[in-house]
């Protein structure tokens, strides 16, 4: 590690002000930033800690609308009773992230803002048609995730919450790396008033994406059997030491079938 100025923000407005200091970075759970700093892949002049801001914490459910504060930890998302009733699929997703240490420190806002191509939350946000709320505006998930580790966030913009309408049916299934527990392929399926959405993480060569062929099949028949013979093109899949593009394409359909079976269950 090296010399860095640490600031504990007292409010979102305070954090936005502190972010103007040199090359500042937001710190919440630190699950990505701190390892990056240790290996000198990131060298911010200032760290602005937002983990103690109460306005950024907690889960609220009002009717069918779910709102989750950006500093809410994975553990809190996984165990919130209101969320388990409104959208159990998202609570289940959070329970699959990392190990207990990661779940108690990592936050939903940090994961979304980082947009790791194998992270779980981006698939959920895309499938649920969520809105990403910042200190300056609201951004539809469809327009928020721009590619590998890229988002629509601008300098000084802070994710404060995510909000979405509770789906009628939803489920998440992932084939995970046994060491990191990141998704080699993760599929979130959600059925709501606007139809069926299927979002995939861990597989696409440009990050999280919607699997339109699977959505079209499920719109006609929301049953795992509707996906028999339906494939996504391997040409748009990433290939690495963990899985080939062809295998990832195969897993997308397999995980989608499992998710539909769970959701329809």
Regions flagged by a language model, labelled:
Residues 1-265:
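C-terminal structural segment of proteins
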